[in-house]
């Protein structure tokens, strides 16, 4: 028998559906990307939600400034137009293509998101590569027992090759 939660997730179509990132995982994510941060970088949380990312930024990134958007506060990520140096957040998985496109338009040197592992496709990696961003690091984790694996991914212009290799040959 399928769980009601799993069924609800599969049927959701509202991009405002949210699942907040547990604070301990936020801290792991921020430590995971710390090496990409330069002094004075503007670090951006495009999906404030409960605020766990934005509120934790100053604990990990001590010489930086921060900004955020949150639709519930009247600050829409898709209308944000300031340039940033780094994006670190947990976007809505249902809108990942639009999120990646908008993220690139903000011209950061590094984009790091917590995404569902099924969102990490060859096509999306190739899209990021074609825009000068390479998958430099990944960290797989189980956020919720009722949801599959998720991945912290780091796409950066500071690298010139992906940390994984793949081919799109259909063998049979």
Locate the predicted segments by residue:
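Class I S-adenosyl-L-methionine-dependent methyltransferase catalytic core
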Residues: 1-172
């Amino acid at each position: 028998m399928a769980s009601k939660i799993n069924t609800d997730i599969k049927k959701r179509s509202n991009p405002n559906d949210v699942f907040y990132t547990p604070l301990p995982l936020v801290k792991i994510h921020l430590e995971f990307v710390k090496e990409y941060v330069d002094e004075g970088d503007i670090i951006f949380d495009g999906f404030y939600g409960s605020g766990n990312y934005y509120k934790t930024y100053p604990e990990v990134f001590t010489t930086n400034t921060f900004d955020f958007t949150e639709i519930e506060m009247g600050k829409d990520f898709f209308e944000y137009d300031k340039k940033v140096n780094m994006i670190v957040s947990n976007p809505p998985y249902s809108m990942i293509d639009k999120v990646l496109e908008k993220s690139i338009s903000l011209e950061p040197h590094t984009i790091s998101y917590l995404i569902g592992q099924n969102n990490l496709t060859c096509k999306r990696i190739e899209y990021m590569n074609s825009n000068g961003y390479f998958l430099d690091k990944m960290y797989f984790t189980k956020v919720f027992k009722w949801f599959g694996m998720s991945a912290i991914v780091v796409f950066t212009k500071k690298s010139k090759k992906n940390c994984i290799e793949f081919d799109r040959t259909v063998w049979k």
